[in-house]
Amino acid sequence: MAGEKLLAFSVLVMVFLPGCILDFGNSGAVSVKIISVGEKDMVWHFGERVTLNVTVKSSTLLDNVTITIAGLKNELNQMKLYKSTVIELAKGTDIISFSYSVPTCSPCNRLDPGVYYVNATISRNGEVLAEGSGTVKLVK
C-alpha cells in the first residue's frame, strides 16, 4: 500500500514538475505605462490642425496593440476627438503621434471654449494595458 502511494506520488511529480522547472523566458509580467498625453499647458484653437503626442513606456516588444485617444466631450456628451490605431510597441519609450483638425465652429459642434480632457487607452486582445490623460485648453 505504501509502495503504491509512493509510486502515485512519483508519477504526479514527474508530470507536474517539468512545468515548474522549465522557464522559456516568459515571466508573463508585461508592463505598459502611458507617460504623457500631449504636452503641459496645451492650447488649441478652433479650426487648427494639431498634433497630439502620446508617450508610452513598455517593458517588452508588443505587436498588435491598439492605442485610442478620445476627448473634447461636448454638451451632448459626444467625443469630438476620437482616433484609434494599431501599432507595434518597442521595448522602452515610444512616442505615438496623432494629427487632428479641431472643429471650426464651436456653436455647431456644441463645443465651448474651455479646458477639456484627452484620454489615451492602450489595449491588446481586448485587455486594457494602460490608461492616461492630459488636458487641453480650447480657445477661439
What is the role of each PLM region?
Residues 127-140:
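Short beta-strand elements
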Residues 26-47:
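N-terminal edge beta-strand
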Residues 43-100, 123:
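Contiguous segments within soluble domain cores/interaction surfaces
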Residues 1-32, 54:
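Secretory targeting signatures
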Residues 104-117:
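Short glycine/proline/serine/threonine-rich loop/turn segments at secondary-structure transition edges
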Residues 29, 62-69, 115-117, 133:
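Exposed beta-strand and adjacent loop surfaces of beta-rich binding modules
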